[in-house]
Amino acid sequence: MSDLTSPKVNKSDADWREQLTPEQYHILREHGTERPFTGPYWNSTEKGLYRCAACDEPLFLSDTKFDAGCGWPSYFEPVKPGAVTEHRDSTHGMVRTEIRCANCGGHLGHVFPDGPPPTGLRYCINGHSMVFEPV
């Protein structure tokens, strides 16, 4: 895990608050979580690219999206190596692996080792942390 990785985009808290919606700010900057089955994209089957809502960096392709039944958009791999960073998360009485945008450090969600082939991983992502670009 890369807890010491510094994001490339650095903005003030005031700049983030001005740019992001309240939901996006809570998730991306305060490490919040949307309730399952309430955020955008959890049941979307459109083809396209999911980008970071904070910095527009490419994160996930629809070709890697699958229905995990958890209520959040789930993917088996990021769009490219290095698109996201992993961080130890020991909040809420459990240990998980948090996923952040490598470009701006925004909180995206968590990754779990219960996904489908070929990776066996499930990137469980808050829909409000992303914007969708159809192809």
From Swiss-Prot:
Q: How is the cofactor bound?
A: Binds 1 zinc ion per subunit. The zinc ion is important for the structural integrity of the protein.
Q: Which GO terms describe its biological process?
A: protein repair; response to oxidative stress
What region holds the MsrB domain?
13-135
Active site located where?
A: 124 (nucleophile)
InterPro entries listed in its UniProt record: Met_Sox_Rdtase_MsrB, Met_Sox_Rdtase_MsrB_dom, Mss4-like_sf
Q: Tell me which cofactor or cofactors this protein depends on.
A: Zn(2+)
Disulfide bonding pattern of the chain: none
Q: What is the uppermost EC class here?
A: oxidoreductase
**Enzyme Commission number(s):** 1.8.4.12
Q: Which UniProt keywords apply?
A: Metal-binding, Oxidoreductase, Zinc
Q: So which domain of life are we looking at?
A: Bacteria
Q: Which residues form a coiled coil?
A: none
* Entry's Gene Ontology cellular component terms: cytoplasm
Q: Which residues bind Zn(2+)?
A: 52, 55, 101, 104
Key word Hydrolase present: no
Q: What's the short name of a Pfam family annotated to this entry?
A: SelR
> What is the reaction catalyzed?
L-methionyl-[protein] + [thioredoxin]-disulfide + H2O = L-methionyl-(R)-S-oxide-[protein] + [thioredoxin]-dithiol
Q: Name one GO molecular function term.
A: peptide-methionine (R)-S-oxide reductase activity
Question: Which NCBIfam families does the annotation name?
Answer: peptide-methionine (R)-S-oxide reductase MsrB
State the similarity comment: Belongs to the MsrB Met sulfoxide reductase family.
Q: What is this protein called?
A: Peptide methionine sulfoxide reductase MsrB
Q: What's the source species for this entry? A: Agrobacterium fabrum (strain C58 / ATCC 33970) (Agrobacterium tumefaciens (strain C58))
Which classification does the entry list for the species? Bacteria, Pseudomonadati, Pseudomonadota, Alphaproteobacteria, Hyphomicrobiales
